[in-house]
Amino acid sequence: MKEPPSLLWGLDPVFLSHARLYIKDILELKESNQVPGIFFYKDHPIKQVDILGTVVCVREKDAFYSYGDVHRSTSGANDLDGLVQELHRQESSKAKMEIGDVIRVRGYIKVFRMQREVVASIFYKVDDPTLDMQIMRMLELPYLYKHAYDKPFILPEDMTNQSQEQPNQAVLQRSGLISLLSEKIMNFVKENTIYNFYLPELESMPSLLSEATNPHYITESDSNVSSSSREIRSLFKEAIHILLKRGIVYQKGQNKDVYYVTDHDKELHKLTLNMIKQDCSRQGHAEKGCHFLHILNCVQQDFGSCINEAILQRVINALEQNSDIVSTMEKYYTAF
């Protein structure tokens, strides 16, 4: 099966998500001929996966230790030393995996020494004595395969001409440019730790501006229009719109000229974490934790309706990666 062009991969939602595939299928994925580290399940590009399974083998490597000293002349130093030791014990108990443990792993696929492996960005033991999560995953996977993974990736109608014989090259080039520009903007705000920005600020950045005026993606008939400031503004707006839909940036309040970067919004992260901590201390949420939609409703009440599911999911993922919260069940979260 022929691979779709790499510029169009961003239009496939499977590529942007953590694919929940059977381990057998992950081992049999075909690596892309265009981009190393990207794999294909049928015609869907896969770069990251979400696995729930049982540990059947443990291979331990040499441990490394870092030794330090603390001056114990004060009670404060003793208290600090005790807290550090307790934290180390808690982390060791959560990180140590034994045969028979049920674990959840999220990460990207990699080939190392001719073997397929998943490099974990987050992993943790799952407390599932009644097998609820495993049964839920067993019921969920056939549905995902039927309605997403096994279905062919079809381009939107506006990217194919009426005869369906040849793709509209001009539309494909513009769409590819917008998708690439959105990725460049996302990387730019991440690498420079930008908390918020105005659209004209991005348009003045040479690295982003050169991408928007890349002649490789501009046809001869449109070269004059595409180089104009109006067309450049349109490209940036559509690229930002993609980031808005993915929850990478958002707008709040009456000022719609400012874009806030979700991953760098400490106030939003702190509010979400405190809300989960407070609600998990209550009797109704103490056992399972808080459901995602309940968290969303509470955050919207305090922060505003500008927070949608995509934005909150990024915040939840960041809190999980920092080990501030863990998922107790599918879409349920609790804080330490």
Curated annotation (Swiss-Prot):
InterPro entries linked to this entry: CST_STN1_C, CST_Stn1_wHTH1_sf, NA-bd_OB-fold, RFA2-like, Stn1, WH-like_DNA-bd_sf, WH_DNA-bd_sf
Region listing for Winged helix-turn-helix (wHTH) 2, in residue ranges: 264-336
Any GO MF annotation of the entry: single-stranded telomeric DNA binding
SUPFAM superfamilies noted in UniProt: Nucleic acid-binding proteins, Winged helix' DNA-binding domain
UniProt main location, coarse: nucleus
Keywords in alphabetical order: Chromosome, DNA-binding, Nucleus, Telomere
Record localization: Nucleus; Chromosome, Telomere
GO cellular component: chromosome, telomeric region; CST complex; nucleus
Pfam families membership: STN1_2 (PF09170)
DNA-binding region per UniProt: 49-126
Record region (Winged helix-turn-helix (wHTH) 1): 162-263
Gene Ontology biological process: telomere capping; telomere maintenance; telomere maintenance via telomere lengthening
Quaternary assembly: Component of the CST complex.
Its biological purpose: Component of the CST complex proposed to act as a specialized replication factor promoting DNA replication under conditions of replication stress or natural replication barriers such as the telomere duplex. The CST complex binds single-stranded DNA with high affinity in a sequence-independent manner, while isolated subunits bind DNA with low affinity by themselves. Initially the CST complex has been proposed to protect telomeres from DNA degradation. However, the CST complex has been shown to be involved in several aspects of telomere replication.
Similarity-based family: Belongs to the CTC1 family.
Name used for this protein in its record: CST complex subunit STN1
Organism the protein comes from: Aquarana catesbeiana
Lineage summary: Eukaryota, Metazoa, Chordata, Craniata, Vertebrata
